[in-house]
Amino acid sequence: MIKNYQEYKEAVEKLKRWAYAYYVLDNPEVPDEVYDKLYREVEEYEKAHPDQIDPTSPTQRIGAEPAKEFKKIKHLSKMWSMEDVFNQREMHEWLERVYKNAGRKDLQFYIEPKFDGASLNLIYENGLLKSAATRGDGEVGEDVTANAKTIPSIPLGIDYKGLIEIRGEVVIRKDDFEKLNHERALKGESTFANPRNAAAGSLRQLDPKVTAQRKLYFYPWDIGYNTLNFKYQHEKMDFVYQQGFIKPFKRAICENEEEIQQLYEEFSKERDKLPVMLDGMVVKVDEIALHEILGYTVKYPRWMVAYKFPAVEKMTRIIDIVPQVGRTGVITPVAILEPVEIEGVVVERATLHNYAEIERKDIRIGDMVIVIRSGDVIPEVTKVLTQYRTGKEKKVERPKVCPVCGQPVLDEGILIKCQNLSCPARVVNSIIYFASKQCLDISGLGEATVKLLYEKGLVKDVVDLFKLKKEDLLRLPGFAEKKAQNLIDATQSVKGVECWRFVNALGIEHIGEVASKKLCEKFGLDWYKAPKEKLYEIEGFGPEMVRSIEEFVEVNKEKIEKLIELLQPTEPKKEEEVENSPLAHKTVVLTGEMKLPRSKIKELLERAGAHVTNSVSHHTDYVFYGENPGSKFQKAQQLGVPLLPEEKMWELLKEAGIEA
């Protein structure tokens, strides 16, 4: 409990440091529960002492009442648009114009990613965030200050005390975009066409609490008004990052066209692997004195350009719309497309989410549509181009029976479900999910193998996986001695799996990884015996989740007990046992090759109470290393962080009562 103002200030600084490590460095220093506990203590102190609240306290991010409309804010200096180039020839022509107007060729160019989101202008005064506004017309934008304060990667306070504008892009990560669209589709709400629209729409919410739920990030790309004297663009950005903003994954200084093109190709290759959308890279003349010499057109500066990637959105035609049955019985319509290449990948199918979405967008077979693809995000139809209709397009009927088993479906309006638990599609997809990486992670049990096992009658249920015999597998096409033995070994190796992984693998509707952990922490392996009123005691469990558990257990109780007998899942360690672990509350880092996969070791360490992070800092307690350790080993040596071999890690885990 915080007793006085000094302790309060120390707690606020600690929260700010932890939040910076989590949201900006992507390297959490403490577990969520430690952060949450101190956050609540700070909140309580602020309620008792409202006159002492630090405006940069993380608690001040959310709290503003919903606005009736957005006010206007005039930018201190103009927010310019940017010229685009789309290929090497156009880039060459832009460079030639720059060289000609600058009167010299010995120039350097500062390169940074072009994030695909919503532009935002932040004004800081006396070290505090004074306002945040959208680009608007470049002169005047909309006041979204309350919303910007909910974005954790935007500092509420900076070290610099002068008046300054810091500009950047608000983005949503690809996986969060996919989840957001999925949730909206389930609720019957319109989905966002792409991550850029999702970021812009989330930033322009009248209620800041809605913005806070959208998991937005802010990447700075320039300084507007300022009284500082920078000589180079890269110095400007170094200054910005020193104030606590996120650095991009890559930035560089190039000296000629060849280096710029090489970097462009590197950006293109890494684009799909990144958590956020890029639509190109920005090339700026690094020497700021040249900016005024090169000047501006009516629309954009002549000293910078966006070197754009090929589009991730393409036009194509829907050939057919077919229904697919998932593991929970939900029937999802999928568009079969005329093949179209997007970023080097041929796209032939795209999700349509649900039949309510088809009706809302009036999607028909034969329509010309816009399709988006981004990295791991499933290709999606975002827009119907009705101007291309000929009158031959066909409307899509909502299915009355399951397309796989032929049984009548339950039509809930937004969702349509097959309720037949023995439906082949439901069974196969349940087994695929059960064996998947995020569940039991049974090696060698992919989609093709599961379908083969089901078609040959060897597996009709997840329980059958643990009854497989090598002689049966050897009769299957593609199975030789080694492959058959590997699959048997893989199914047996999951014995002793953690309770929460077992629960998560069952595929109970609305019960994911987080809820599975909470269930097991509260009830252990007896989770399925817990009465309804006890389930409601778990934080975050509402009627929908409780009903899902009840309905699942009612139908599958015998199967749950059989699987517990076969798998012998491990009970979660009690809090007092974790406290006695030599690894309790230790921040650790792994480097090098070890005898088990990194994900498995991370789980074991977390069960022992450790917090596993991705990079080494002064706050790291141990770095455990295996064969061929990487740069983290050298970083630990430089910082004086204890380096322990893999064998020592296993000793500490054993001491904590954790067996591999």
UniProtKB/Swiss-Prot annotation:
Q: Which family does it belong to?
A: Belongs to the NAD-dependent DNA ligase family. LigA subfamily.
Gene3D superfamilies, alphabetized: 5' to 3' exonuclease, C-terminal subdomain, BRCT domain, DNA ligase/mRNA capping enzyme, Helix hairpin bin, Nucleic acid-binding proteins
Stated name of the protein: DNA ligase
- Asked if NAD is a keyword of the record, the answer is yes
In this protein, which residues make up the domain named BRCT? Answer: 578-660
Q: What does this protein do?
A: DNA ligase that catalyzes the formation of phosphodiester linkages between 5'-phosphoryl and 3'-hydroxyl groups in double-stranded DNA using NAD as a coenzyme and as the energy source for the reaction. It is essential for DNA replication and repair of damaged DNA.
Binding residues for NAD(+): 32-36, 81-82, 112, 135, 169, 284, 308
Q: What is its EC number?
A: 6.5.1.2
Active-site positions on this chain: 114
Chemical reaction(s) catalysed = NAD(+) + (deoxyribonucleotide)n-3'-hydroxyl + 5'-phospho-(deoxyribonucleotide)m = (deoxyribonucleotide)n+m + AMP + beta-nicotinamide D-nucleotide
Q: Which SMART domains match?
A: BRCT, HhH1, LIGANc
Mention any Pfam family matching this sequence: DNA_ligase_aden
Ranges that cross the membrane = none
What gene name is given for the protein in this entry?
ligA
**Which NCBIfam families has this protein been placed in?**
dnlj, PRK07956.1
Keyword terms, alphabetized: DNA damage, DNA repair, DNA replication, Ligase, Magnesium, Manganese, Metal-binding, NAD, Zinc
BP terms from Gene Ontology: DNA repair; DNA replication
Any single Gene Ontology cellular-component annotation? cytosol
Q: Which cofactor does it need?
A: Mg(2+); Mn(2+)
Tell me the PROSITE patterns matching this sequence.
BRCT, DNA_LIGASE_N1, DNA_LIGASE_N2
Q: Which residues bind Zn(2+)?
A: 402, 405, 418, 423
* GO molecular function, a single term: DNA ligase (NAD+) activity
